[in-house]
Amino acid sequence: MARRTPSQLNMLLAVDKPVGCTSHDVVSQCRRALHERRVGHAGTLDPMASGVMVVGVGQATRLLGMLTLDTKSYVADISFGVETNTDDAEGEAVRTVPVAPELRDLAYAREQLAAMLGPQMQVPPAFSAISVNGVRAYKSAREGNAVDLPPRPVEVYAADLIAVGGEGDTCVWTVAFSVSKGTYIRALARDLGRACDSAAHISALRRTASGVVSIGACHAVEELSAESAAGFALDPIAALGATRVDLPGNLADDLLCGRCIPVERALADFDTAKAPFALVLDGGLKALARIEGGRFVMEHVFPQAIGGVR
């Protein structure tokens, strides 16, 4: 079996996903733009959503599972009066309720949003990528089958009202959310509508941050190329929240072989209490490690250094 050719690009990138395409579409576009096959992403966005999408290229794809634990931030338009089978504007209406006057009251809106804060059990939307007996929930839902998803623990850290709009039979709350991993904003809108004795769905959604990566760090896929990518690379150590440790270049073979390295070989002082430790050689991220018995013990070794370290 032929061995995979090492990636020429190894980095994290922040892409501003446009409305109308899937997360997989963005990955495919990045593969073509960068001429790299090994590309993945951290955290799916629905086709109708836009915003922050962290993409891993080459060795950096191995970091993606560590990034999905991060807090996510969104700005959402929540439209009242209609609940849909997908909990967003792309679905079919399943329940319609006249818009009550109090929904336009700012104090009432803030009170209802405040009640959403904190840990809670959330039932995901039926149209979601969660697997049920090996089948994606959205596939079963599209076939007309009843989808019964168990509630999952999530947490809403912030739900700040930005505006109340809409005219006539419509009322729209624009809300800035900060939530834990696995929280569905569509489900929050659905549950908010019910809590207000109404019906609601998401009519627009934009992810504004994923962990420490904000929308200001993002670039359109059209801006990316194999030549320009290095200038757009995210600092992988900052994205992971790791502690940087610089090591001398003559330890490259030891790192590549996964050998333990004495802590005193570090080129500068660092906080030994703040794991994980990002081991840097010649300006590139070569490994992630923990400390045991005064030595760095390798947890992840990257044969090709991950770029973007600042």
Spell out what each predicted region is.
Residues 1-18, 24-41, 45, 49, ...:
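Accessory RNA 3′-end/elbow-binding domains used by RNA modification enzymes
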Residues 2-187, 191-217, 288-289:
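RNA pseudouridine synthases
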